[in-house]
Amino acid sequence: MTELIKKGSGAKEASQFLAQATTKHKNAALLNLSNDLLIHTATLLQENEKDILRAKQKGTPETMIDRLRLTEERIKEISEAVKQVVALKDPIGEVTNMWKNEAELTIGKTRVPLGVIGIIYESRPNVTVDASVLCFKTGNAVILRGGSDAIDSNKALMSVIQDSLEASGFPRSSVQLIEDTSRETAQDMMRLNRFLDVLIPRGGARLIQTVLENATVPVIETGTGNCHIYVDKAAEKQMAIDILVNAKCSRPSVCNAAETLLIHRDVAEDYLPAMETALKEYDVELRADERAKGILQEAKAATESDWEDEFLDFILAIKVVDSAEEAIDHINKYGTKHSEAIISNDYATGQAFHQKVDAAAVYINASTRFTDGFAMGFGAEIGISTQKLHARGPMGLTELTSTKYIIFGDGQIRN
């Protein structure tokens, strides 16, 4: 608790400095950070290797080790991502609305930082930089608590970040890492209302549920991704195959990867064998309902939990449905309100799908893998929010702000 109090106090103080920082000053600091990450590549890789070795000794699946791994190319991508945030418009100080009321008061609504943001996350070291940069750009101080499996990588990254920001004239406490990775400290952080204005969990279902059940700090939920691809009877065959393979296999360990294929009965016998062949190239394990299993050559029988699970692996659940309505009902029952896709050339069916499916992102004839800040064109995101307050979908710069009313008068009093 001592570490939390010390760093919470420092973050609160730093947030006041950051709220007054100019866009020019913040951007200059971020450009320096982008360069410093490249300069320290060798050290970052050396520290990351400690985490990788520990994960292998534990028998961690390769798909999860991939989330943990830093490479020279990935550090270049992280550095480039920092530059992309520099290029984005700073929302702080933006006047979103202005009007005069009956009392001749001029009322303006402007964007301001949230204050101090707490982020609890799991394996991916790139989150340490992404989260730090987004919070910093929007004038927020941030306290990060990563998983124990990435502690050496995170400490090394935090050292680079803090040294770089300090050299640019910002407090080291603008961005901080909780180095105690115990559950007790995480629980204490969830109740740090004295210093934290909001808490954002990024990780698996268990982590997110733990935060939701225990936090007294306001939480923005970044939900798990049990994403579906529905192949309609009016779907183009090759398009459906290409989208399915991309959504499932391009990076199965991320939250916007597809976990379940729903396919209309009218095209199942024709499309499923070709899909199985394409997926076999990636050694995808298929878990199918009775009708799909009767068509596929190699598939295990799906269980109830297979419709609910976020596999984060080369595993795909498959179900044959009688109609688009059945697919929609299945998605709304088992989905996590993240990203859902329909493949169909029927306009009315596509419209019905996007209107009825409850998700942060709904795709028509495209892969779910585009639910990402960079892919959508607004830079790195702090996470994918699956709730409806305070933000929904990929959370970029604007979603890390609040609003303040500024009222100008010339002596008005209220009768």
UniProtKB/Swiss-Prot annotation:
UniProt keyword Oxidoreductase, yes or no: yes
A Gene Ontology cellular-component term: cytoplasm
A single GO BP: L-proline biosynthetic process
GO MF, one example: NADP binding
UniProt cross-references to SUPFAM superfamilies, sorted A to Z: ALDH-like (SSF53720)
Protein localization: Cytoplasm
Pathway: Amino-acid biosynthesis; L-proline biosynthesis; L-glutamate 5-semialdehyde from L-glutamate: step 2/2
Enzymatic reactions: L-glutamate 5-semialdehyde + phosphate + NADP(+) = L-glutamyl 5-phosphate + NADPH + H(+)
Coiled-coil regions, chain positions: none
Similarity annotation: Belongs to the gamma-glutamyl phosphate reductase family.
Protein name: Gamma-glutamyl phosphate reductase
Native source species: Listeria monocytogenes serotype 4b (strain CLIP80459)
